[in-house]
């Protein structure tokens, strides 16, 4: 779809309360994927679109739960849905489904065959929970270990202490991805994943090939490296959500959930723009 005046009019957000609010097209993508109300008991009265808008506002602005604006549903209600969907792994499932839809939209197979792996160390706060010191980045906190496909769509994220080396955290991440994307075989990586340790850890987990893309010894200053720029761009996309500027969460489950929310935000906007014409 061409990004012309008609498309701009369809996707403009000036009528929304906040820039993070979903458009009608984005909600049409997300709504069928949310769980229905439970049978029996008190009928559901809350508007799930308002709940999703509140969660996206939290992700985009990075504000505290207590600072959630009053025109959203009550804070306790929004928190309840966020944690319930975290515990049921709904955020992970939504990201998975939207990735496959976006890939098919681009004319690709739903399950990728190649991906790019990297990690991002971020500081934690006094909230507690698992953390560690990344001596290379000089950061005390956690690592977000991600693998996007070659389009830059985040396939999965694994959060762990920052003192876990990349090659030690990679096997668990790749095993989790293989379960969800069974055709994934080839991984592009930087020098932090070089050596036999990672390859030995992946034995018995499928037919993996790890391609190390190193920076040239003669290069001076900034250099765009083939394939590796894809994962750096994905991390930059996720970084548009200020909730991810630091790791504010006590549990790694919540940390992972917010990363998936950021991915869902990107994917729903992408699909709404190109896949659902009026």
Positions of the model-derived regions?
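Short alpha-helical elements
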Residues: 1-278
């Amino acid at each position: 779809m061409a990004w012309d005046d008609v498309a701009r009019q369809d996707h403009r957000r000036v009528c929304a309360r906040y820039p993070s609010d979903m458009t009608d097209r984005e909600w049409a993508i997300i709504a069928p994927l949310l769980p229905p109300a439970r049978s029996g008991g008190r009928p559901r009265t809350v508007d799930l679109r308002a709940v999703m808008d509140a969660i996206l506002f939290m992700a985009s602005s990075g504000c505290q739960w207590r600072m959630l604006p009053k025109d959203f549903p009550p804070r306790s209600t929004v928190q309840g849905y966020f944690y319930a969907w975290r515990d049921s792994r709904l955020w992970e499932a939504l990201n998975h489904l939207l990735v496959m839809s976006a890939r098919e939209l681009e004319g690709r197979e739903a399950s990728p065959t190649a991906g790019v792996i990297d990690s991002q160390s971020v500081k934690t706060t006094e909230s507690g929970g698992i953390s560690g010191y990344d001596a290379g980045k000089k950061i005390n906190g956690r690592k977000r270990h991600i693998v996007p496909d070659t389009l830059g769509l985040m396939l999965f994220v694994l959060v762990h202490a920052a003192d876990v080396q990349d090659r030690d955290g990679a096997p668990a991440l790749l095993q989790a991805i293989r379960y969800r994307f069974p055709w994934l075989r080839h991984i592009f990586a930087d020098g932090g994943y070089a050596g036999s340790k990672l390859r030995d850890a992946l034995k018995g987990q499928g037919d993996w090939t790890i391609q190390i893309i190193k920076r040239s010894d003669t290069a001076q200053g900034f250099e765009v490296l083939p394939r590796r720029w894809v994962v750096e761009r994905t991390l930059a996309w996720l970084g548009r959500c200020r909730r991810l500027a630091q790791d504010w969460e006590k549990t790694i489950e919540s940390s992972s959930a917010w990363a998936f929310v950021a991915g869902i935000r990107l994917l729903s906007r992408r699909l709404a723009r190109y896949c659902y014409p009026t």
